[in-house]
Amino acid sequence: MDLQTSIKSYKNNVASKYEFLDASNLEQIGNQKYFCSKKIDGQTFFLSVQNDNIQILNSSSQDFSINLQHIVEQVKNLKIKENIILVGELFDNSKKRERNGDVIVALTSKSSNLAIALFDIVKQENISNSFLEKYEKLKKLFGDDNTKPIFALSQ
């Protein structure tokens, strides 16, 4: 799995199509099935697990694993056996309201208050076809307990 290519492809083909929805434009979805989650105001980060190598990168593919060892250790404890790249929002879990600027400050201080709320699978060995299958896999791997440093964002 080429990590940089996967991140770039996700940003160009998936993230660029994210849409903000509120009550005023919800009708545009119509009767289509859709998934939505709380918007966390942090920074988009990618989690890569490849052959027991765990990396946490920002959307520019800069590796912040050394600053986020508390998350890396939690992922190691999960003993994930497949190569997989996930995406989520990195945020300061100690604040009542998430703010992008808090992430920048916390990264420089290697704060253990940072958490990552995973919301999608970028690439995996065992392919899940639908988003629902991907979400179920996220929940199975990481749970949805938002008090932990890493969790699947509830839909």
Regions found by a protein language model. Name each.
Residues 12-14, 101, 149:
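N-terminal cationic leader/targeting segments used for protein routing and processing
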Residues 15, 23, 106, 115-117, ...:
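A sequence-composition feature that detects small, non-aromatic residues
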